[in-house]
Amino acid sequence: INDPTIPAIPTDCSNQGAYNDLGGAKGIIGVNPLPYDNGSYYTCSGTSCSANNNVATAQQIVSPVYAFSSDNNGVIVSLPSVPSGGTTSLSGTLTFGIGTQSNNQLTAKNIFTSNGTEQDGSFTTTYSNGSYDSIFDTGSTELFFDTPSNQPALTVCSDNSGFYCPASTTTISTQLSSLGGGNNMNFDFSIINFDNYIQANPNSVAIPNAGATGGQN
């Protein structure tokens, strides 16, 4: 917003821009299942700012979808598959509302009930006999996770810190589960060497199978 009365942006906000630059994005909008963005906020006084994790709901950023007068119960994000070599352009659709109009019906679906009580919209992922809180987030450009202690650690990239760079493409098997059970789905995915991929595909705007450490999310 660049309000001149507000002090300098805290570095833990401004440092995030490097990942937008890497992806060639002007900006990234993330849509999650929650009506309010219960993330990190700051309270500023004079020239100093400090983190404030107790911002009243009425002062939090409202999801633009939730603010609609109708068709506000969710979104459908539809994108085509990305080839292994990436692509220089990708187009999809963002449909507002689910089951509210003739053109936003779900014909094939796996429904995962998320954890609304903790205000994070999470469900459960089982990976290598461990259970982890997980989310679907349209603003996350990679698969964020940490390697369990009972699995060989994935090599972290030297050129792009925080991303994974295994010696060869690595397949990981997980199971996704709704809150309280009720619906389970096996989810296998692969992780590429991110450094090698970027060098070979410098103009790619959609990168399949990119992984990063969970600490970045």
Show the residue positions of the predicted features.
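Aspartyl protease catalytic domain
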Residues: 1-131
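C-terminal catalytic lobe of pepsin-like aspartyl proteases
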Residues: 67-69, 77-217
